[in-house]
Amino acid sequence: MVKWKYILGEEALPHAADSADPHAPRIELRTEWLKTPGRNGRFSIVPIFLTFCGQGRGMSGADHTFPLYKEVIHMSTVFITGGSRGIGAAIARTFAFKGWNIAFSYLHSEEAAHALQNELSARGISVLAVRADAADPAQAAAFIERAVQELGAPDALVCSAGVALPQDVLTHVSDEDWRRVFSVNVDGLFYTVRAALPYFIRRRKGAIVTMSSMWGQIGGSCEVAYSASKGAVIAFTKALAKEVGPSNIRVNCVAPGVIDTDMNAHLSAEDMQALAEETPLGRIGTPYEVARCVRYLCSDGAEFITGQVIAPNGGIC
């Protein structure tokens, strides 16, 4: 299955005078179209040229044709775990804005997942939403296999599925709660990357982004389970980057500070205000500020960056 996207041409359009000017050019648009392969064998029709014709100041009356798209390249595809809400949904939207095809998994938020799928599909990209528990090795692998079948091999993988516990002292953390945090935040990362890695290695390229937290870097009081699991994510990232670097695969980690998402819903308004005041930039971060870091690490601009932890945290650590 072949997918294509187009790069906007750099040629400048002729300057158009103020529309109130009686001598302003009268412009007629003529569009030529190109038929391109689309999802499941269907074709998309996209413009490749605009022709301006008209008379007035700055225009000779002759036709002016400008290419909208200069080259055709393979459309990029990203797989995202935990993509239906919060930071995961912001990541999906950020990639969609850049024209990437997207497969994302979700667990409980079925309504939000389908709403996001419809929203992103309206941009003309291919979007797949799959219900899968990252903590289940069979479901994690099934998500990757389904995504490959529908969209082809991934160019990037973003592991953003994660859970946290309400703040409490370690002696009040149950065995089940401890195991659940690690099963999603650490085991789920392992299961997902293990399933996807052969597709990256086979093509000898790709980017993997994991999701830690500032608590994984500095630790958080009454957040021992979460902090420990996110510290493990950082170690996983650094080790894997060394392992797959010779295959031209980059692995990096994003470790956000306090971000305005549902995961922090257990914090009181006073707690959030206190955290904002402790942040040098004086505010809480947004999911899209994290998402832009993730997308950058998957872009060509980061092609010599691997094994690193990027911390969008407002300077808090």
Regions found by a protein language model. Name each.
Residues 253, 275-305, 312-314:
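C-terminal helical subdomain
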Residues 98-115:
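Conserved glycine-rich Rossmann-like NAD(P)H-binding loop of the short-chain dehydrogenase/reductase
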Residues 213:
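Residue(s) in the substrate-gating loop at a strand-loop-helix junction
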Residues 168-170, 174-182, 271, 275:
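Substrate-binding pocket helix/loop in short-chain dehydrogenase/reductase
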Residues 84-85:
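Conserved glycine-rich cofactor-binding loop
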Residues 193, 229, 237:
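Active-site helix of classical SDR
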Residues 198, 242-246, 303:
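Alpha-helical segment proximal to the catalytic Tyr-Lys
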